[in-house]
């Protein structure tokens, strides 16, 4: 009887590919790792061999029971049966996050790990097209993420690496946390600014004269080629015009 795996997950089982991924993670024996999606425990087992402690979160009951049996003697692994979107990451502990995330939950999960965790490094296997969207500063997701993390591709993972085979290719990406570009006290204003900016609702943000001043100060000649740094400059002008700085 075929088991109904929640979220129609695609699993990495190829030993060579798993080892390539592990090599890219650059984990140390002192690292604490939180894994998103235990799956069948293939990656979990390898993570536990090279890190101090692995806490793996899995929502699907069948997979949780399967991996619990497989990993029950591994003292370095703690399994948690929970939705990652409901999971509370620790505030004071140092840790890294690793995970292969369901394609249709990519946006929710990446926001979760960036904005609701304190992980220094985050490694995610995502659909290739989604990775490109995280870099697109003409989209709200890209503008929000870039304030907290830098994003880079580490590995290409063709569809053939997964079972069952998905219709799209995937990539392993690394998100490295840096000092925030937008202080907490301005975050709500920034999210409002971004929502209007990406929809080109400039009149909701500036008067005509203010808009021209902001563009001039940011040295923007063409809005279609605006950079992330220029958008930050324009946001700072928005704060100044509204008496927030």
Curated annotation (Swiss-Prot):
It is an enzyme of class 2 (transferase). GO terms for molecular function: 23S rRNA (adenine(2085)-N(6))-dimethyltransferase activity; RNA binding; rRNA (adenine-N6,N6-)-dimethyltransferase activity. PROSITE patterns: RRNA_A_DIMETH, SAM_RNA_A_N6_MT. Gene3D superfamilies: Ribosomal RNA adenine dimethylase-like, domain 2, Vaccinia Virus protein VP39. GO terms for cellular component: cytosol. It catalyses: adenosine(2085) in 23S rRNA + 2 S-adenosyl-L-methionine = N(6)-dimethyladenosine(2085) in 23S rRNA + 2 S-adenosyl-L-homocysteine + 2 H(+). Its EC number is 2.1.1.184. One of its GO terms (biological process) is response to antibiotic. InterPro entries: KsgA/Erm, rRNA_Ade_diMease-like_C, rRNA_Ade_Mease_Trfase_CS, rRNA_Ade_methylase_Trfase_N, SAM-dependent_MTases_sf. Keywords: Antibiotic resistance, Methyltransferase, Plasmid, RNA-binding, S-adenosyl-L-methionine, Transferase. Disulfide bonds: none annotated. S-adenosyl-L-methionine binds at residues 10, 12, 37, 58, 83, 100. NCBIfam families: Erm23S_rRNA_broad, erm_B_23S_MT. This protein produces a dimethylation of the adenine residue at position 2085 in 23S rRNA, resulting in reduced affinity between ribosomes and macrolide-lincosamide-streptogramin B antibiotics. Belongs to the class I-like SAM-binding methyltransferase superfamily. rRNA adenine N(6)-methyltransferase family. This is rRNA adenine N-6-methyltransferase.
């Amino acid at each position: 009887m075929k088991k109904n795996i929640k979220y129609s997950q695609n699993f990495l089982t190829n030993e060579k590919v798993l080892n390539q991924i592990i090599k890219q993670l650059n984990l140390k024996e002192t690292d604490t790792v939180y894994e998103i999606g235990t799956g069948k425990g293939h990656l979990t087992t390898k993570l536990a061999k090279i890190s101090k402690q692995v806490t793996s979160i899995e929502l699907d009951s069948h997979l949780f029971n399967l991996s619990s049996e497989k990993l029950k003697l591994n003292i370095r692994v703690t399994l948690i049966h929970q939705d990652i979107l409901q999971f509370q990451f620790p505030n004071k502990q140092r840790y890294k996050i690793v995970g292969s995330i369901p394609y249709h939950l990519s946006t929710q999960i990446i926001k979760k790990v960036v904005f609701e965790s304190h992980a220094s490094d985050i490694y995610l296997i995502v659909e290739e097209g989604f990775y490109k969207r995280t870099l697109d500063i003409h989209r709200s997701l890209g503008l929000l993420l870039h304030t907290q993390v830098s994003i880079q591709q580490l590995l290409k993972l063709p569809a053939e690496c997964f079972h069952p085979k998905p219709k799209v290719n995937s990539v392993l990406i690394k998100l490295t946390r840096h000092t925030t570009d937008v202080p907490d006290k301005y975050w709500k204003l920034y999210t409002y600014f971004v929502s209007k900016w990406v929809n080109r609702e400039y009149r909701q943000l500036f008067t005509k004269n203010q808009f021209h001043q902001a563009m001039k100060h940011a040295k923007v000649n063409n809005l279609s080629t605006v950079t992330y740094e220029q958008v930050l400059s324009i946001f700072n002008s928005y704060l100044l015009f509204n008496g927030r700085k």
